[in-house]
């Protein structure tokens, strides 16, 4: 018999953030590591392409703030979601694990938003 009043799950929201963070971490983050972590220190950028003034101006624009926010928050949600499910798979039961991991991700998201807005 089908339950006429099924309990709604909040899991699709967290899986969505997990998937978005995973895609961001697989596509965008490696490019940023290559550009900023390898090519920039080796001096392979033309002229002042990534000078302090240009990077600061980008970081203070709306697009730059959104990019920095997503660069921090999406992989954070992905990692904490993965940790939550890894603990479950390893049969390590954290009391109120969903609240611990997703709560920490939410708190760090707010901290990141405050940090990004004060640049």
Curated annotation (Swiss-Prot):
Biological process terms from the Gene Ontology for this record are: fumarate metabolic process
Signal sequence, renumbered to the chain: none
The entry's localization annotation reads: Cell inner membrane
Annotated GO CC locations: fumarate reductase complex; plasma membrane
| TM annotation in the entry | 25-45, 55-75, 99-119
Please state the protein's primary subcellular location. Answer: membrane
Query: Mind listing the GO molecular function terms for this protein?
Result: succinate dehydrogenase activity
Keywords, in A-Z order: Cell inner membrane, Cell membrane, Membrane, Transmembrane, Transmembrane helix
Q: Topologically, how does it sit relative to the membrane?
A: Multi-pass membrane protein
Annotated family? Belongs to the FrdD family.
Subunit organization: Part of an enzyme complex containing four subunits: a flavoprotein (FrdA), an iron-sulfur protein (FrdB), and two hydrophobic anchor proteins (FrdC and FrdD).
Q: What does this protein do?
A: Two distinct, membrane-bound, FAD-containing enzymes are responsible for the catalysis of fumarate and succinate interconversion; fumarate reductase is used in anaerobic growth, and succinate dehydrogenase is used in aerobic growth. Anchors the catalytic components of the fumarate reductase complex to the cell inner membrane, binds quinones.
What NCBIfam families is this protein classified in? PRK05470.1-1 (NF003977)
Q: What is this protein called?
A: Fumarate reductase subunit D
The coding gene here is: frdD
